[in-house]
Amino acid sequence: MPKSFSELEKQNIRGILIGSCRLSWKNYGYKRTNIDELCQKAGISKGGFYIFFPSKERLFYETLLDVQQSLYTLMEDILAEEPGKSGLAKALKAVYAEYDKSPFLYDTASADFTGFINKLAPEEREAIGFDSLAGAKRLLAKSYLTLRIPEEMALSVLASLLNIAANKEKLLYDHFQVFDFMLDHTLDHIFG
């Protein structure tokens, strides 16, 4: 029978599992992330894992939501410090750097990511997309900029720019410089 944990221990262990999952997912992908190893890092048995998450997929789902929230917080902090176009550019460049460090964030077409997402319940898949869209809309509002084009087009253009990270190997030039150039030359057409 698994050990019982205090609420504080549960919070800490849950945080360790999510943090370890994030690192393992980044380094090895979904399929090669081993629950036994994550449990070992958290100091719990595999049976104890199920006190915190009903499945490997649920851990990954919670990890992905945590990653999304971290990105929103990063952008919100930058925009709070520097609202306007320059702050939005700085925030998007910071997000792009995170995308580059963690390919699982943007390589949604990979077999590894598809294998994970297909195991989620439909409402969980929908929540990931909804959270992403809602977060993007919230951040546009926090930039205090006026759109020159429809919001859906603006969001699509910015998402397309961030997807440069998924194709960086195909570029003939440094992908960070390409992203920066395209972003800097696009923002004036999106915002007034």
What do these predicted regions represent?
Residues 72, 118-155, 177:
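Amphipathic alpha-helical packing segments from all-alpha helical-bundle domains
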Residues 14-22, 117-120, 124-126:
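A short, Lys/Arg-enriched amphipathic alpha-helix from helix-turn-helix/homeodomain DNA-binding modules
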